[in-house]
């Protein structure tokens, strides 16, 4: 049965519809906001897998070109593998939703939001998020919903709910917030040095609308009726000999949890686990049927030890207190041939960042339904398996795309405008070691490599990952969390920024009772930590170098009148090709008359610039040129001043010059009876100099008539 509900959210109505499309799915909702429409479906498999310690969830957001009235570019005219944007939106949907599924369900779950229409004004990603959340909540799959999402921009000191693309572009804050009726579950966004207070206010504002959208979903259920939920695959059991296990391992496990060094600590914990397993196996208390419960009980004890130590003793497994940051070592210029490089090591997390400068030809061309774009800044994050001491495939997964995007948006607000620095910038972060917060290490290393490359960034940027341990009554915010603290803790809050404010952030929360005061404490602690990290980075490099690397391509720019672009290009590109070949430069001409030269030899580039300036320069009386004799006739010679400008040097204007000899040796005859008359000396009063085609002569513009014809005279040295 078709049902439609709507709610005013910002400038438009959010319309949710079910019962018309994709009725064979476990759940399907069509969401519309303005002219953007997304269909979200959810399905689960029939097969059941027991004793899973994770939710087998996949989210596949996809955008159809027909949604914007377009046909895919390229040779293959159909949508292919997911673009980075689709991967990022899939992660936005996945992260707040995943903790609300019951692991005991045991079936694979697939959520597929598909953009069917877009007005290219209202971003379809936020529409897709709400469509997906509603589809799952209305389905027969066990889900602890409802949840909803809202985007905010901050423009002219006002918050805009679900802003347009243009408003996002002009805003100093772009934030997406997701949550349930119990509280916030996810925050992500980028900013241009906003304060912690503005960020907190944005989250508060977004949560007002999140609660309204959640209630809209509940109203949907009350209208169509709550569906009977599918059964769980198994009931969560308890290891029968848990008390015996605790008595056997607790003391030894506690010591193992505080062994220094990630690898040594992991090895010590695994040894305790192995000994315990062998003990219980030997007395037939662990077998294939209950070993899952054994491992779960062991992990519960490890979690209890780590969390209790932090809450009661303010002591973390590596010996730090809650506010301490791991030792930091930073350096630049490790790689001599690259344009800029930096190594940032924080504890056992290490990021090598390399900046490369290219030309506009190297820009990333984005062909998607929001319109074609050209990106002149890219950040690529690589996480090879050796960074955690493992083997595996070298590939770019969703995690790499997501972490790279967070680091990129944390840095891009500090980059110069393209008009001021017309290079294409690519930063590559190689994670060489990892024990938590590698994306924030990428921000730090990337910022320093940009400065080392001579990119005129506005401010240094640093990042830090914050964690949380809470028992409901008491909480402890952790600075610079380890990988295990991310896994065993209640929050992962990454914050990047400058000394002036926040530029990037991402927060995932596993608990529902996160108060505003808690978030305020976390942001303040992150600010203090960020200042500490910035001070260390600034001691290595505090400002961008005055010059770019000698290995980087050089750029020279000039501006010409639009109506003279054709003169520089020449017939069939002849003129610009000649400049390219002669001076070994790459020439880019914009429609507004801006010309950019790319090359490696500064002297040749300046000569190329002078050549172009001479082509477009308007000649003036009195100017002197080194011209080329192009053609000689009975009245004089045509002299090329520029590739597209010629002047005429008449015989009368030629004065005798010993460098050239006289007309008796010219192509026009010899002696007294030449084609100029019986006696040239009688005609002109002196012998005119000899000229030859291709000869270079110094001439001065003596006159320009009303038709633009140029008269020349010879210049003596």
UniProtKB/Swiss-Prot annotation:
Cofactor: Mg(2+)
Enzyme class: transferase
Cellular component GO terms, alphabetical: cytosol
Top-rank taxon: Bacteria
Location of the KH domain: 553-612
Ligand binding (Mg(2+)): 486, 492
InterPro entries with a match to the protein in the record: ExoRNase_PH_dom1, ExoRNase_PH_dom2, ExoRNase_PH_dom2_sf, KH_dom, KH_dom_type_1, KH_dom_type_1_sf, NA-bd_OB-fold, PNPase
Positions with biased composition (Basic residues): 666-675
Catalysis: reaction(s): RNA(n+1) + phosphate = RNA(n) + a ribonucleoside 5'-diphosphate
Signal peptide: none
Region ranges (Disordered): 659-689
GO terms assigned for molecular function: 3'-5'-RNA exonuclease activity; magnesium ion binding; polyribonucleotide nucleotidyltransferase activity; RNA binding
One Pfam family it belongs to: KH_1
Biological process according to GO: mRNA catabolic process; RNA processing
EC number of this enzyme: 2.7.7.8
Family from the record: Belongs to the polyribonucleotide nucleotidyltransferase family.
NCBIfam families found in the cross-reference section: polynuc_phos, PRK11824.1
Record's function text: Involved in mRNA degradation. Catalyzes the phosphorolysis of single-stranded polyribonucleotides processively in the 3'- to 5'-direction.
UniProt protein name: Polyribonucleotide nucleotidyltransferase
Higher taxonomy: Bacteria, Pseudomonadati, Spirochaetota, Spirochaetia, Spirochaetales
């Amino acid at each position: 049965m078709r049902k439609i509900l709507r709610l005013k959210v910002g400038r438009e109505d959010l319309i949710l519809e079910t019962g018309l499309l994709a009725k064979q799915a476990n759940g399907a909702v069509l969401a519309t906001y303005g002219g953007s429409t997304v269909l979200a479906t959810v399905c689960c498999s029939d097969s059941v897998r027991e004793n899973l310690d994770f939710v087998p969830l996949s989210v596949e957001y996809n955008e159809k070109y027909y949604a914007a009235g377009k046909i895919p570019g390229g040779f293959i005219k159909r949508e292919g593998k997911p673009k980075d944007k689709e991967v990022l939106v899939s992660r936005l949907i996945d992260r707040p939703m995943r903790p609300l599924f019951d692991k005991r369900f045991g079936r694979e779950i697939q959520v597929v939001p598909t953009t069917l229409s877009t007005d290219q004004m209202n971003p379809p990603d936020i529409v897709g998020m709400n469509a997906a959340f509603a589809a799952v909540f209305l389905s027969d799959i066990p889900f602890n919903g409802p949840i909803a999402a809202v985007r905010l921009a901050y423009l002219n000191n006002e918050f805009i709910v679900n802003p347009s693309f243009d408003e996002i572009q002009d805003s100093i804050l772009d934030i997406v917030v997701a949550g349930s009726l119990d509280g916030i579950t996810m925050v992500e966004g980028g900013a241009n040095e906003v304060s912690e207070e503005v960020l907190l206010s944005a989250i508060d504002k977004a949560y007002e609308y999140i609660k309204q959208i959640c209630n809209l979903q509940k109203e949907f259920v009350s209208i169509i009726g709550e569906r009977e939920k599918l059964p769980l695959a198994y009931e969560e059991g308890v290891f029968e000999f848990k008390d015996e296990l605790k008595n056997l391992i607790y003391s030894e496990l506690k010591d193992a949890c505080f062994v220094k060094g990630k690898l040594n600590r992991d090895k010590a914990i695994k040894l305790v686990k192995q000994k315990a397993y062998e003990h219980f196996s030997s007395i037939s208390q662990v077998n294939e049927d209950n070993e899952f419960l054994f491992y779960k009980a062991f992990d519960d004890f490890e979690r209890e030890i780590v969390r209790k130590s932090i809450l009661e003793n303010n002591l973390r497994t590596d010996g730090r207190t809650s506010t301490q940051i791991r030792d930091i070592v930073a350096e630049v210029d490790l790689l001599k041939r690259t344009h800029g490089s930096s190594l940032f090591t924080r504890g056992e997390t290490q990021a090598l960042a390399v900046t490369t400068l290219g030309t506009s030809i190297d820009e990333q061309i984005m062909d998607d339904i929001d319109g074609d774009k050209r990106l002149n800044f890219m950040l690529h994050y690589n996480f090879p398996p050796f960074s955690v001491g493992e083997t595996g495939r070298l590939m770019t997964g969703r995690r790499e795309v997501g972490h790279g995007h967070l680091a990129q948006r944390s840095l891009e607000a500090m980059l110069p405008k393209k008009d001021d620095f017309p290079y294409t910038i690519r930063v590559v972060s190689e994670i060489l070691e990892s024990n938590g917060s590698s994306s924030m290490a990428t921000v730090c290393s990337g910022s320093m490599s940009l400065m080392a490359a001579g990119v005129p960034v506005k401010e240094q940027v640093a990042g830090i990952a914050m964690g949380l341990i809470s028992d409901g009554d008491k909480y402890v915010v952790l600075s610079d969390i380890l990988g295990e603290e991310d896994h065993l803790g209640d929050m992962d809050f990454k914050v990047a920024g400058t000394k002036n404010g926040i530029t990037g952030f991402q927060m995932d929360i596993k608990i529902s009772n996160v108060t505003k005061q808690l978030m305020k404490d976390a942001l303040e602690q992150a600010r203090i930590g960020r200042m500490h990290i910035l001070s260390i980075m600034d001691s290595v490099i505090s400002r961008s170098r005055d010059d770019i690397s000698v290995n980087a391509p050089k750029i020279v720019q000039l501006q010409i009148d639009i109506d003279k672009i054709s003169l520089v290009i020449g017939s069939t590109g002849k003129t610009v090709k000649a400049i390219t070949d002669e001076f070994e430069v790459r020439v880019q001409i914009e429609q507004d008359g801006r010309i950019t030269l790319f090359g490696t030899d500064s002297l040749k580039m300046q000569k190329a610039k002078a050549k172009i300036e001479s082509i477009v320069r308007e000649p003036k009386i009195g100017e002197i040129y080194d011209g080329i004799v192009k053609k000689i006739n009975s009245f004089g010679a045509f002299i090329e001043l520029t590739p597209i400008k010629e002047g005429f040097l008449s015989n009368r204007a030629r004065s005798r010059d010993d460098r050239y000899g006289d007309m008796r040796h010219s192509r026009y005859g010899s002696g007294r009876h030449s084609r100029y008359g019986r006696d040239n000396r009688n005609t002109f009063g002196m012998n005119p100099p000899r000229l030859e085609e291709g000869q270079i002569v110094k001439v001065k513009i003596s006159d320009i008539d009303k038709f633009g014809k140029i008269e020349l005279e010879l210049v003596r040295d």
